[in-house]
Amino acid sequence: MLETGQTAPDFTLPRDGGGDVTLSAQRPKAVVLYFYPKDDTPGCTKEAIGFTEHLDAFTAANAVVIGLSKDTVAKHDKFRAKYDLGVILASDAEGDVCERYDTWV
């Protein structure tokens, strides 16, 4: 488990829309990294829409929002398009990053 002040483990994962997202490449921005179980489920949809609705405030605070689940990039692309999401959606299909962050989604 990560402790307060501990550096978050770096990762590179495929993301919605193609390409990859690397945590360390986001510097010097702050990163809001949220883990969620599954695309297009009621709670996860509400969460992603909420982050998208507040994206301007995160951007103004020099922060980037990354949602991470075990869904495939293809599922992320459908989820993003269906709800016009503005956050980055990273695919941890093997669960390696979830394991390093000691979270189960």
Question: Where are the regions that the model predicts?
Answer:
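Chalcogenol-based redox active-site neighborhoods
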Residues: 1-105
